[in-house]
Amino acid sequence: MLIVISPAKNLDYDSPVPTAKSTKAALLDDASELMDGLKTLAPQDVSQLMGISDKLGLLNYDRFQDWQLPLTKKNARQALLAFKGDVYVGLDAYNFSAEDFDFAQQHLRILSGLYGVLKPLDLVAPYRLEMGTRFANDRGKDLYAFWGDKVTAELNKPIKKLASNTLINLASNEYFKSVKPAHLQAQIITPVFKDWKNGTYKIISFFAKKARGRMSAYIIKNQITDPELIKQFDWDGYQYNSAMSDAGQWVFTRKQ
């Protein structure tokens, strides 16, 4: 069983890391090729491409210029510890044990606009490049064209090694669009988190993102390899809702 999640725009390169282990991203050569193109952009081009302020455009221009191989612990840190969005608040990897990191390294992957697919302990330098960014490149009009079948092929590698041919999709739609389900050698289950509001269950973005991280941590800390056991997830008041679920979409609801 393999879990996939999205990266985050917010980063943490200051907190002390709780593990000395690190690995190298599998698609680093592709990332380097992509970065060669990004380095040609002026600060205002970065702002326009990403739809961000001039200040953030300059920050990410500088990140592109500073990005260089080899990635080491001096200029990069482990992906699971570098990202700091709502999903990662829920994951709380800074409190992982050595066993948690080992299990995550086998069973968790992070989809990335720059790196394609990341293992939790793969070193990443500071960057921002969302998968939906329409950055024209030698392979096509955007990042989906750039990555083509490579993301799916990279996910198939651990899927072949794991006992259960199931992929738990805890990534956003923007990132999961980089995966080609027809070529994925796994059944896809997408957990959905809904909260009670104004008389009905709704997806509330902040809560849903955090819940994706919480479920990832639940699977990792309990070393779950049987997808059916995910239905027992009850952290933060969520419960599996069989009436709202189907084979490919498992709905978890919460009344606050």
UniProtKB/Swiss-Prot annotation:
Pfam family, one: H2O2_YaaD
GO biological process: response to hydroperoxide
Alphabetical list of InterPro entries matching this protein: YaaA (IPR005583)
GO CC terms of this entry: cytosol
Annotated family: Belongs to the UPF0246 family.
Designated name of the protein: UPF0246 protein TERTU_4575
Taxonomic source organism: Teredinibacter turnerae (strain ATCC 39867 / T7901)
